[in-house]
Amino acid sequence: MPQPPVPRESRVRAGIVPPYLLLRIAAAEEHYDVAADAARRSLLRDEPMRELRVEGAHPGLLPHEHTRSATTGRDHDVEAEGEGAPVDAAVPEPAPDRRISDAQGAESLPGHLVRTEGQPATGDVAVDQAYDGLGEVWALFERVYGRDAIDGEGAPLEATVHFGDHYDNAFWDGERMVFGDGDGEVFRGFTQSISVIGHELAHGVTEMTARLRYRDQSGALNEHVSDVFGALTEQYAMGQDAEAATWLIGEGIFTELVQGRALRSMLEPGTAYDDDVLGRDPQPAHFRDYIVTDADNGGVHLNSGIPNRAFALAAVELGGFAWEHVGRIWYDALTGGTLRPNDGFAVFAAATLAAARERYGDVSREVAAVANGWRAVGVEPE
């Protein structure tokens, strides 16, 4: 069964845009009148974030049998059945339950419900992008990993769009995904990126499973897991293999005024943007460059680049579709019940290696690729 809900006062507002980037924008008022003001107000809204301090982990789901959908052609998982087990045709197929609300520029949640599952497109771009994006995230988790929604039991997928006045972020608040429209100078609307939508929903999955504390190394892992499943959602939706994938998080949310491709690059941390005003992407790509700081909840958005690169390197080494191999390993590690809220990189690396051995065998390409990925970024599994 899923973990009991986290009390609202203990929930983390896990935003996709790091505070260090908002601070740079806030200080750039001579270049961006609207964006600087929007960034300052966004920082004030995000300041009351609380740390997640919940102990324990959900044991997760059992391994699933690998099958291919006859209707979509995509890979997905079904519960392994005993030989000759009868199939109950009356059991309905899992389906998403999407509920999109509109905050109409206010900061109160959830806003006005404007589109529910099965309803036609509204014509509001943000509403319809959120609806479609949630469908893609649900498809990845259900068809590949056998997880029906965030809690694994078909809970509604709730999202609110048009949050705040020029709000420069998107976040998971413990119940729903919330998307701002951006300021129009630096950021476009945050529903434009499937990787952002997948990133935010994955925070909910982490909250229901390993509950990685949102600070220091465990917080960087929390952000890393969301980046992983954000990237995999985009790759799955677009049918991209590991070589064709961009490995970018938030591609398309910068306007043409910014010299940058995205918020983060998983394959090449530190290269996502290099802008005369906003500066250069500060993410480290190796553990020797780990940033010790009190800001950004102990550098959760900064240091997530280290495990991000380990994952991407393992996926590229294996080739093919990343969600089929390294994605399965990371999902097994996240939901396997061995992680604790304060675990760091070395413990998580060991969990992924154990998951790879369990699924693919001690002597396998998958185990070697995962080990090589962690070795390349200087993390020694504990």
Residue ranges, per PLM feature:
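Zymogen propeptides/activation segments of proteases
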Residues: M1-S195, E207-E382
